[in-house]
Amino acid sequence: MSEFKLTTVEEFEEATARLLETGAKVGADAWQFRVKNQTPHCKFGEQGVCCRICSMGPCRITPKAPRGVCGCDAHGIVGRNFLKFTAGGAATHSDHGREICHTLYCAKDGGNYQVKDPEKLIRIAKEWGVETEGKDIYDLAHEMAETGLMEYGKPFGYQRFLDRMPAGQKEKLIENEIAPRAIDREVSTSLHMAHMGCSSLPEALVKQSIRCGMADGWGGSMMGTEFSDVLFGTPKPIDTEANLGVMVEENVNIVVHGHDPSLSEMICEYADSKEMIDYAKSVGAKGITVSGVCCTSNEVAMRRGVPMAGNFLQQENVVLTGACEAIVVDVQCIFPALGPLSKCFHTKFITTSPIAQTPDAEFIRFNAETAGENAKAIVKMAIDNFKNRKPELVHIPQLKQKATVGYSVEAIVKVLDSVTNSQVDETGTTKPLLECITSGVIRGAVAMVGCNNPRIRPDYAHIELMKKCIANDIVIIASGCSAQAAAKAGLMDKSAKDLCGAGLKRVCELADIPPVLHMGSCVDISRMMILAAELAKDSGLQINQLPVVGCAPEWMSEKAVSIGNYVVGTGIDTFLGVDPYVSGSSEMCELLTEGTRKWTGAAYTVEKDIDKLVDLMIERIEEKRTALGI
């Protein structure tokens, strides 16, 4: 058996450099060049001290001008900007959840969308107090979808899923006025507070930032995750591959990109059909390969084993291969640059959502009622485009790694049951994992999430942090582009156990798992919150006592700020490798790195030096162990 070997970041970079050579031949632009054109960045923006929320400005804070025209100081301006950043992210993730609710409402027997996990639907219905006895599963699905949609605008009460928290934690959030109410209310309240002439008190702005994030994580995102499982199946371990080498030169290559599984699931369904495969062969291809970029890739990887072509900063690379017949996108994290870039090649750049329309794209509006018809048309368009390839521009880097993905909370519990003595011990709990942590076999866990960011060497922070954590017997649960970085490197191959400390290696062998567990897309960080809550309840602890931390070393988007706020709001210390534009306010820095502890039991740590960042995470995990006496 050959020795296991990681793919290095240097190898990623060599592959990209070769693709950029192809791009140069056709005059293509790429993010590497645009970054240079935008450097150096605006220092006022980086510090968060630029205000443009009214037409008396824009105002920027300097030692000579410490207040804006209205009198707001740096602390208020930075706080308002942070809150607006959060609101943008919470609205985006929660709108994803809303779309999934609408799709569930359209589900029907024999229709485009069907209920794949009726047991989970019934379980959530009972959790919400919805009667299930004697109901047709689709009648129940429609009732649950409508009930879920009411969570966005209900006039009273808090998010239903907050009841999943350990006893006392929900009450603490209510007491500190950060328990999320209606999802749309928290977004609207945030924008109201950040309006000219409203809040400029940093403490109030940070509290609402956490509350708004919590509406995302324990509201919109959690519904997006749970109802996607109902519609498309709850993920379980499945083997796949990752990196650009998953594209096949002899096949029609369709790349799905974005975040909404309603689109990608249907594309995969039709690309797998005999009719479309036969049609592809009729135009000279050997078959059809669907691969993915970003979170929609994570969605279809963990349910179907569809290979992952790459993460956020590789979206241009799939076009630069010259072998991509169509890149089909839905919403979020889509470069407008894909339009002009695709025109340099034969690639069809197809947008499908009225929420994400860009120039130089072909727009095919996708909706639940016509999903099958839309998907079939898109797959056929890609096949018809195969003949337009320019062979001299085709180059697919032969980099790929094996990955085992699909570790939902349910799948993790099932894995734990497999190493439990069912004659003696209780099954269906997280207690075996707690025993590993208590005994010190595993020191703790890191939830590694987030994006790529050109400010940091792409993928390097994710991969290096993970390598050091697993070497120190700290298990990683990963989602989003962080998960794809791990998969591309090989850290989701079960053979990566050889990179672990002795304790974690033994656990990986016994449970037959990789040391980095793929939990899904960015909305699926809600799975991590559910897992943390289950660990706390099974141990009798509060979440903030667990030797668990969160980390987003290369975060980039507004969604990441919302995520960070709900992870902190849940009680999990969160470590960032990129400053969240608050350095211009000492009060905001203090509140986010220490002040939030009195409300949630957790706070942020920001450290741009990756070596120092991982040491701080390990140190925090060990501090928590010491406090527990383990």
Task: Please give the residue ranges for each predicted region.
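Anaerobic metallocofactor- and corrinoid-dependent redox/one-carbon enzyme cores
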Residues: 2-630
